[in-house]
């Protein structure tokens, strides 16, 4: 028995207000109708302290670059300052469930939290595995690259390069053909 499904996509966005030098980092997760602040997602993954989250993102070389990265993260830290526990983060995320979803009509908060936990485990970086620490490491690496590109240290990835292409095996391609014909 083989299960075929569409690729899950997550986007990490860095937005800024032009007049102020404030940078917001937000993440768009499947089944949620709006972008969630970065530190809320980290807290939903089990990283509670802001220091621990910053250690996942920053290289910790004690260089000037670390200070620049911290300056870029300041507004994101402030966005999630009212979230103190993992349950608080999951409860915050339940308010943004898609209205087309069955669980958005549930009134029981524990059912919604279980559903959000399932989204965090299964739909957030599914290629990394089910362990929260692996997801935190990957999210930290992604945000690190985003911030370094914003500072001009990294260039954009070449989307046309074969290094950045997804290679689909013959089984997945046949499954996609069968799924399209249904």
Language-model region placement:
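N-terminal non-catalytic structural scaffold regions of very large proteins
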Residues: 1-182
């Amino acid at each position: 028995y083989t299960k075929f499904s569409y690729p899950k996509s997550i986007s990490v966005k860095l937005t800024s207000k032009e007049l102020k030098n404030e940078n917001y980092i937000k993440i768009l997760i499947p089944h949620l109708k709006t972008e969630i602040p970065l530190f809320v997602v980290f807290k939903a993954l089990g990283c509670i302290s802001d220091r621990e989250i910053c250690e996942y993102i920053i290289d910790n070389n004690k260089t000037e670059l670390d200070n620049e990265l911290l300056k870029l993260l300041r507004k994101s830290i402030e966005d999630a300052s009212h979230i103190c526990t993992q349950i608080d983060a999951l409860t915050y995320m339940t308010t943004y469930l898609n209205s087309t979803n069955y669980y958005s009509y549930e009134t029981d908060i524990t059912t919604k939290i279980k559903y959000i936990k399932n989204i965090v485990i299964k739909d957030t970086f599914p290629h990394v595995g089910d362990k929260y620490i692996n997801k935190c490491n990957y999210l930290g690496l992604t945000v690190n690259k985003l911030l370094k590109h914003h500072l001009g240290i990294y260039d954009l990835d070449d989307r046309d390069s074969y290094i950045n292409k997804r290679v689909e095996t013959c089984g997945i391609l046949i499954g996609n053909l069968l799924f399209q014909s249904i």
